[in-house]
Amino acid sequence: IKVGLYSITFLGLWYRGKELSLKQMIKKAKKYGYDGIEIDGKRPHGNPNDWPTRRCKELRSIADGEGIDIYSVAANNDFSSPICEHWQSQIVYVRELIRMAADLGARTLRVFLAWRGVTRHPQIAKYSLARKIWNYTHTLTTDEEDWDRCREGLLESARYAGDYGVTLALQNHAPIIRDYKDMLRMIHEVNSPHLKACLDLPIMRDKSPENIHRAARQVGPLQVLSHYGGEFERAADGSIKNNIGNEPYVHFIRAMKEIGYNGYIGYELCHPLPVVDGKTVGIEFAEKNAQMAAEFMHGLLKSYG
């Protein structure tokens, strides 16, 4: 298993301060000991309108020169929207990200079934407004209708992915998806060789050892991508502690080993961050956590992977 850094960590959304450019991200990933990067599919990092083929190939050349892989791109798509124009624009967005991923040499595109979005107020991101809008637009639709729209979006997107030689990695991420069983149900219903799984531990509701191993066995060879997250602190004995607990990750890594997974597990810092003295923490908080996250995961893989 290889360790990656997801660019949402340095997108400038959740901390005070500017984003890192993708060139800076590549250097940061190398400095911290990551094997590769995953590029978030929105500005200022990975909006496909900003990344024509020529520019993608230039970035890939820079990454290759640093020994850093560009292993994935991440879509922030919402295939659940009942608004025709919104739903159709999401198909175009994902299709263009598939093209961009292929031009970057990335093997996977992370996709959602649905996504509420984020807003800036004025700099720090928030989920609350986007969540209210999403919830309101779904008040007159049924769960079955939402599911069907998501399936239709993935069916069309999987065809585009096949054209470009890219694999869509469906994440077990809410809304619509409640747990890994929903993720697997959708993958089986779409029934495309170009749609696989992205099972992530942090967003599993049940993190018991039994459920972690059960989920891994059921996902099996469909697993092509994974993420980890959280905030880290160094204990007095020098060990690194994760805020959701280290033990679930031990079981997750063991479970991934048991199913023969050898792809990437990428770190992401993607949630509202602490407020200190009345201000949200700055980029140094993201840097500290990204550095410790790499050390944390490499240590787990050495011991249990």
Model-derived segments and spans:
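Active-site acidic/histidine proton-transfer and metal-coordination neighborhood
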Residues: 23-26, 56, 60-69, 80-196, ...
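Short loop/turn segments at strand-loop or loop-helix junctions that form parts
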Residues: 8, 75-76, 112-116, 268-270
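A short beta-strand-loop structural module common to alpha/beta enzyme folds
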Residues: 35-44
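Short, small-residue-enriched loops and turns at beta-alpha junctions
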Residues: 45-47, 77-81, 116-118, 174-177, ...
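Histidine-acidic metal/acid-base catalytic patches
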Residues: 1-33, 105, 177-305
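A short gly/proline-enriched turn/hairpin at secondary-structure junctions
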Residues: 42, 171-173, 270
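Conserved beta-strand positions in the central sheet of alpha/beta enzyme cores
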Residues: 38, 72, 110, 169, ...
